[in-house]
A protein has these predicted regions:
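Bacterial c-di-GMP phosphodiesterase EAL domain
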Residues: 1-38, 201
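Hydrophobic faces of well-ordered beta-strands that scaffold small-molecule active sites
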Residues: 1-5, 28-33, 47-51, 71-76, ...
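Conserved alpha-helical "signature site"
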Residues: 58-320
Length: 320
C-alpha cells in the first residue's frame, strides 16, 4: 500500500499524479492521508483512507459509514482508549495503537498476578534459589500456565515441549528465564486466549534496545549491557500495563541503577536511547534522528534493529 498526502507541495503535484496513475494501472493498493483542510474524497476513490481520530470525530454523522462502504477506513493518532472505542464503532476497520501507552483512569487496582511477577523478577535479579521462585508460582498457578505457554511459543520453539517450571529453568537458564518473566508480565493470566498487544510492543522495544545498545557512543560501562537494555525496553511500558506511575513501580523493583535511572529520568545512554525510540514511535522523527545521531547510531543500524526486533516479537504467540 502506498499512501499519498491530501496536500502535496506545488512542485510535487504532477509527479504524484503520474506515480498514482502508474500504481493504479498496476493494480496496487493506494491510500489517501486525509486532512481537515481538504474535503474527503468520494467513497471508492481510494482503497484506503487514513484519518486522524480527532478529524474523524469532527465529521458529520454517518460520513465515515458512507466512506467505509467501498473504502477501508484506518484511524491514526488514536491516543486514548475512548478514541479507540469510538473509531471502531464508527466504521474504522483498523487503528494505530498510541492508546496502548496511555494509562486508564478506571479506578481498578493493579493486577495482583502481575505484582507477584514483579516480586519474582526481583528474586531472579538477586539470584534467588529455585525453591523461592517456585513458591510464587504455587501461589499463582495461572502464572505457571502462562509462562509455559509463552516459553513454548514460536520465538523459542523448543524441540520438546517445556512442561514444568524447573524444566524451564534448566533449559533456558537464569538469563533467558528473566527475559521471559519480563514479557510474561504483559500476558493476560485471566484470559490466556486473548493476545495483549502490549506484549508484542514491549518485546519489540526490548529487543530493539538490546540490538542498538552495543552501538552506543560513548560505549556505556555497564555490566551485561544487552540484558540491561532489554529490561529498559520491556519495562518502559509497565506504567500503561499496571495503571501505576513509573515512580510507584520502581519503588517495588530493586533494579540496577543504570536501568532505574533510564526508566525514571531517561538518564544515561540507555535512557537517551529509550527517549529516541519513544520519539520515533510518536512520529517525532526529527527529534529521534537528532538523538540517534548524538548517540552514534546511524539510520541503517537503527532500521536493521527495528526490522529484526519486529520480526522477533511477531513470533511471540503463546501456544494453546
Amino acid at each position: 500500500m502506498t499512501v499519498f498526502p491530501a496536500l502535496p507541495g506545488p512542485l510535487e503535484i504532477e509527479a504524484m499524479k503520474q506515480y498514482e496513475a502508474s500504481l493504479r494501472q498496476a493494480r496496487c493498493k493506494v491510500a489517501l492521508l486525509a486532512t481537515p483542510e481538504i474535503k474527503l474524497p468520494g467513497t471508492g476513490a481510494w482503497d484506503y483512507l487514513l484519518i486522524s481520530a480527532s478529524h474523524a470525530r469532527s465529521l458529520p454523522p454517518y460520513a465515515l459509514l458512507g466512506m467505509a462502504s467501498r473504502t477501508v477506513v484506518v484511524a491514526k493518532d488514536v491516543h486514548s482508549h475512548n478514541d479507540r472505542d469510538w473509531v471502531l464503532n464508527n466504521a474504522c476497520t483498523l487503528s494505530t495503537s498510541e492508546f496502548l501507552q496511555s494509562r486508564q483512569n478506571t479506578g481498578k487496582k493493579a493486577d495482583m498476578s502481575r505484582i507477584k511477577l514483579l516480586e519474582m523478577l526481583a528474586l531472579v535479579a538477586d539470584d534467588a534459589d529455585t525453591g523461592k521462585l517456585e513458591a510464587i508460582f504455587r501461589q499463582e498457578p495461572k502464572l505457571s500456565y502462562s509462562l509455559l505457554r509463552l516459553v513454548n511459543s514460536a520465538a523459542i520453539a523448543p524441540r520438546n515441549p517445556i512442561t514444568s517450571f524447573a524444566q524451564a529453568i534448566n533449559l533456558l537458564g537464569r538469563r533467558q528465564l528473566q527475559r521471559w518473566l519480563q514479557l510474561l508480565v504483559y500476558a493476560d493470566p485471566n484470559n490466556s486466549q486473548r493476545p495483549n498487544p502490549l506484549l508484542q510492543k514491549a518485546a519489540a522495544r526490548g529487543r530493539q534496545l538490546e540490538l542498538l545498545a552495543p552501538h552506543l557512543s560513548p560505549h556505556p560501562q555497564v555490566e551485561c549491557l544487552e540484558d540491561a537494555a532489554f529490561m529498559v525496553g520491556t519495562f518502559s511500558l509497565l506504567d500503561a500495563l499496571l495503571n501505576m506511575s513509573t515512580k510507584e513501580i520502581l519503588q517495588q523493583l530493586p533494579l540496577a541503577p543504570v536501568v532505574n535511572d533510564a526508566l525514571a529520568e531517561h538518564a544515561g545512554g540507555l535512557g537517551k536511547l529509550l527517549r529516541a525510540i519513544e520519539a520515533a514511535e510518536a512520529g517525532e522523527l526529527k527529534q529521534a534522528a537528532s538523538t540517534m545521531k548524538a548517540l552514534g547510531i546511524t539510520s541503517d543500524i537503527y532500521c536493521d534493529a527495528q526490522l529484526a526486533s519486529y520480526s522477533w516479537a511477531a513470533k511471540i504467540r503463546p501456544t494453546a
